[in-house]
Amino acid sequence: MANLILKQSLIILLIIYSTPILSSQARILRTYRPTTMGDMDSQVLLRELGIDLSKFKGQDERRFLVDSERVSPGGPDPQHH
């Protein structure tokens, strides 16, 4: 009988303490950032990611984003079973 009362008490306390958490709402933060990625300028995004664009001046500005030595895979090896 004592175990049943203890279990019921714990369940009631759990419900009471979890109610504020379940009913809480998210707060909207006002920021200067655009809401969608389509509106964001790539230079702004790179600056926010911590990439210093001044290091890449004098070179092709997009070259550091794409590796020109990359080789596309040729598919499955015909010798492999």
Swiss-Prot record:
GO CC terms in record: apoplast
Keywords, ordered alphabetically: Developmental protein, Differentiation, Glycoprotein, Hydroxylation, Secreted, Signal
One Gene Ontology biological process: regulation of root morphogenesis
InterPro entries reported for this sequence: CLAVATA3-CLE
Sites of Hydroxyproline modification: 73, 76
Domain of life: Eukaryota
Signal peptide: 1-26
Residues bearing attached sugar chains per UniProt: 76
Family indicated by similarity: Belongs to the CLV3/ESR signal peptide family.
Protein name as it appears in the record: CLAVATA3/ESR (CLE)-related protein 6
Gene that this polypeptide is encoded by: CLE6
